[in-house]
Design a protein with these regions (language model features):
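Residue-level recognition of pore/gate-forming positions within transmembrane alpha-helices
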Residues: 46-50, 71-74, 78, 100, ...
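Transmembrane alpha-helical segments that form core, pore/gating elements
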Residues: 1, 52-53, 85-141
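Hydrophobic alpha-helical transmembrane segments of multi-pass membrane transport proteins
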Residues: 16-35, 80, 97-109, 137-167
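Hydrophobic core positions of alpha-helical segments in small-molecule transporters
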Residues: 17, 44, 66-69, 91, ...
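Helix-capping/transition residues at the boundaries of transmembrane alpha-helices
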Residues: 33-35, 60, 114
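A helix-boundary/kink motif common to multi-pass secondary transporters
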Residues: 37-38, 64, 118-119
Length: 167
């Protein structure tokens, strides 16, 4: 699937733009989770539709009323699911919002590249660049990765790989 019409040069630009954004997204998401809780960190990350809507508006695309309605309903549900009393750190909230903003930038910017080059190719290039950026941290925890190889493969293949094939 990747080899068909595969030109590495055309993937450099999306990789260099989206890869660092993906690395920022990952680091800030996990930092938010560490400073607060999984529920608060993931809840903040899932505020990204609001930022996608805002970015699209800034690009001149007027949101449809049903989109605003559905996102509003989603945020009301998110409010009820989040346990506000678990918010321990304003810094964690900041990291969660940065994670959501970087994810929304990946979606908005990546849409153009994906329509031209294909989503799988773009995902490959951004994952490659993000992996290179974060390799130092992976190297420092290589013993954990080796001890937990099955978990690492599951997280890498199923959660990341399968998730990205839908995008």
């Amino acid at each position: 699937m990747i080899r068909k019409n595969f030109n590495i040069k055309e993937l450099i630009k999306p990789g260099l733009i989206l890869g660092p954004l993906l690395a920022i997204h990952w680091v800030t998401m996990f930092e938010s989770i560490e400073l607060n809780s999984i529920a608060v960190g993931i809840g903040l990350v899932f505020s990204y539709p609001l930022f996608v809507l805002l970015l699209e508006f800034l690009r001149g695309n007027k949101p449809k009323s049903y989109q605003v309605f559905l996102i509003s309903i989603g945020f009301i549900g998110l409010y009820f699911l989040l346990d506000i009393s678990n918010i321990n750190s304003l810094e964690g909230i900041f990291y969660g919002l940065i994670s959501a903003i970087s994810l929304s930038l990946i979606i908005v910017i990546g849409e153009k590249f994906s329509s031209q080059l294909g989503g799988l190719k773009v995902a490959f290039s951004q994952l490659l660049v993000a992996s290179i950026i974060l390799i130092k941290f992976t190297y420092e925890s290589r013993e954990w990765l080796i001890d937990n190889l099955a978990v690492s493969i599951f997280l890498g293949f199923f959660l990341t790989g399968v998730g990205l094939t839908t995008y």
